Amino acid sequence: MAKHATPKLDQLESGPWPSFVSDIKQEAAYRAANPKGLDYQVPVDCPEDLLGVLELSYDEGETHWKHGGIVGVFGYGGGVIGRYCDQPEKFPGVAHFHTVRVAQPSGKYYSADYLRQLCDIWDLRGSGLTNMHGSTGDIVLLGTQTPQLEEIFFELTHNLNTDLGGSGSNLRTPESCLGKSRCEFACYDSQAACYELTMEYQDELHRPAFPYKFKFKFDACPNGCVASIARSDFSVIGTWKDDIKIDAEAVKAYVAGEFKPNAGAHSGRDWGKFDIEAEVVNRCPSKCMKWDGSKLSIDNKECVRCMHCINTMPRALHIGDERGASILCGAKAPILDGAQMGSLLVPFVAAEEPFDEIKEVVEKIWDWWMEEGKNRERLGETMKRLSFQKLLEVTEIAPVPQHVKEPRTNPYIFFKEEEVPGGWDRDITEYRKRHLR
């Protein structure tokens, strides 16, 4: 019999989708049975108390978690999020319920043996509940107590060769897509870039010194499988400078129905005959494509790299050969100033190891943001407050048309002194020689 009645949570198990409630109940039953005979280092009933406190929150319409100060491991300023329940007598199993963030490998490649060892640590020293993965990309280990933190950290670092992730006002754990290891559209090695910058900026990751969090995300192509354009302060997205490659015969094969569009995805129902006009040409956001009945043409200078045509006809269209990445800045979720998408800063960078060109931009941004950013102000909010123009100045990047968001509406142009010949100072005598009273 369950420790707590949870009628509201039970409803969440009734839908067609997998339920986190079922997962927690399964873990509660496993811990109660204890088939491995473990000497649990945290209360055996912590998953049941977790359900109980959540049911109470549903009943009362308010949270019963509090942020009870700073907990962590020696020498690190991040990686552990301290959480305490404000009803410890009712739910002693979750009186302390700290979260441990564990750095994921580039591309999130794991061996079964590694995952088994990780879960063995967490079964013994935590609740057994995990989240694979958090929105930053970390492995999230949900629920342990303060005395176990150093023990967990020791086992992760000494036995699994794994580090903690980032939390607090620091660099969060960089995240990348699968990149060149699996994807035919990869324009640069996103996994290598992610690893290189992770190792380069260990201090920034573990010792908070920023106004607020800062996230790197690396997408190897414009499909954006880690959504860097929407979820990271510094987004590196693969792109190409030359033309999309067209296989004219393969285009005709798609039109004739010989090849399935979208590489066979969405084939669970009959969508009718493939219509290249409706499904490709008319869906191009910049209207840079034309089909004359026998030939597909692309005005590449108008292409915005949306990837729709390439995804729809991958055997006929392919990314160009002059490949690299674009750098965008300022994306974030709606905390203080509303959600923001990334703004293009560097239209094209070669993105080759050791990625020094990317590091130069990063460090100039940090120098400015750490000086000018307010407490708990993301980079995107600093950009909005002090202007994108200021960001261009501090990064020493020349303005280009791609930086323009929209035509300006202010008729006044404000020049800087260095932009005016002779500056602000004028010799009145010389002026009167040219302009009589």
From Swiss-Prot:
Residues 294-322 form the 4Fe-4S ferredoxin-type domain. [4Fe-4S] cluster 2 binds at residues 284, 303, 306, 309. Keywords: 4Fe-4S, Iron, Iron-sulfur, Metal-binding. InterPro entries: 4Fe4S_Fe-S-bd, DsrA, Nit/Sulf_reduc_fer-like_dom_sf, NO2/SO3_Rdtase_4Fe4S_dom, NO2/SO3_Rdtase_4Fe4S_prot, NO2/SO3_Rdtase_4Fe4S_sf. One of its GO terms (cellular component) is sulfite reductase complex (NADPH). It comes from the Bacteria. One of its GO terms (molecular function) is sulfite reductase activity. [4Fe-4S] cluster 1 binds at residues 177, 183, 221, 225. GO terms for biological process: sulfate assimilation. Part of the complex that catalyzes the reduction of sulfite to sulfide. The alpha and beta subunits may have arisen by gene duplication. They both bind 2 iron-sulfur clusters, but the alpha subunit seems to be catalytically inactive, due to substitutions along the putative substrate access channel, and because it binds sirohydrochlorin (the dematallated form of siroheme) instead of siroheme. Heterohexamer of two alpha, two beta and two gamma subunits. This is Sulfite reductase, dissimilatory-type subunit alpha. It comes from Nitratidesulfovibrio vulgaris (strain ATCC 29579 / DSM 644 / CCUG 34227 / NCIMB 8303 / VKM B-1760 / Hildenborough). The lineage of its organism: Bacteria, Pseudomonadati, Thermodesulfobacteriota, Desulfovibrionia, Desulfovibrionales. The gene is dsvA.
